[in-house]
Amino acid sequence: MSGGGDVNMSGGDRRKGTVKWFDTQKGFGFITPSDGGDDLFVHQSSIRSEGFRSLAAEESVEFDVEVDNSGRPKAIEVSGPDGAPVQGNSGGGGSSGGRGGFGGGGGRGGGRGGGSYGGGYGGRGSGGRGGGGGDNSCFKCGEPGHMARECSQGGGGYSGGGGGGRYGSGGGGGGGGGGLSCYSCGESGHFARDCTSGGAR
């Protein structure tokens, strides 16, 4: 039955089976039919779901079978028992956050964007300057309630700030950047981008 198009082999009766495995990120997996036979390929586009289309391993499902253009059978119209929506993988759309979800927003340290896992993996989620707490805490001193530009702690400047730590642990290290002095004029209390004197050091 190869060639023209997909052919539905169900004959009206839905088949039952169990999910063998399903890769949420890649969007496909395999179902083991209850009545025996080979495992059937299933793509996320064939899943009936009220939200994110995924399947959980060992989940009971019902499905129709269709033969694709290359003659291989695959599961389609996959649902839970009695046509109910599938339970799916509890990880949802981001597979429980995944590496891409770690860290705060972009920019300098991720503090402002706020990620549930804090500084995360450096350049990926948090920007390049040290990660931050992810919960609006200062990336210089680690205390909540203010940003680094408002920090009263000297010695950090914009040169360090630590690694942010994994999962918001605060990290350690950080360099001594010379306090809160302007790089343009050397005066304390403002940064070069806010400098009005225009003088060079």
From Swiss-Prot:
GO annotation (BP), single: embryo development ending in seed dormancy
GO cellular component, one term: cytosol
CDD domains: CSP_CDS (cd04458)
UniProt zinc finger (CCHC-type) residues: 136-153, 180-197
Coiled coil: none
Subcellular localization(s) per the UniProt record: Cytoplasm; Nucleus, Nucleolus; Nucleus
Keyword Metal-binding: yes
Induction: Down-regulated during cold acclimation. Accumulation during silique development is AGL15-dependent.
Keywords attached to this entry: Acetylation, Chaperone, Cytoplasm, DNA-binding, Metal-binding, Nucleus, Repeat, RNA-binding, Zinc, Zinc-finger
Record has Metal-binding as a keyword: yes
PROSITE patterns referenced in this protein's UniProt entry, alphabetically: CSD_1, CSD_2, ZF_CCHC
Ranges where the CSD domain occurs: 14-81
Recorded GO MF terms: DNA binding; mRNA binding; zinc ion binding
Residues where N-acetylserine is found: 2
Annotated signal peptide: none
UniProt cross-references to InterPro entries, sorted A to Z: CSD (IPR011129), CSD_CS (IPR019844), CSP_DNA-bd (IPR002059), NA-bd_OB-fold (IPR012340), Znf_CCHC (IPR001878), Znf_CCHC_sf (IPR036875)
Tissue-wise expression: Mostly expressed in shoot apices and siliques, and, to a lower extent, in roots, cotyledons, stems, shoots, leaves, floral buds and flowers. Present in shoot apical meristems and siliques (at protein level). Very low levels are observed in cv. Landsberg erecta compared to cv. Columbia.
Residue ranges, compositional bias (Gly residues): 89-109
Region (Disordered): 66-109
Known role: Chaperone that binds to and unwinds RNA and both single-stranded DNA and double-stranded DNA (ssDNA and dsDNA DNA). Regulates the flowering transition and flower and seed development, particularly at late stages of embryo development, through regulation of gene expression (including MEA, FIS2, AP1, CAL, AG and SHP2).
Family indicated by similarity: Belongs to the cold shock protein (CSP) family.
Name assigned to this protein: Cold shock domain-containing protein 4
Organism, scientific name: Arabidopsis thaliana
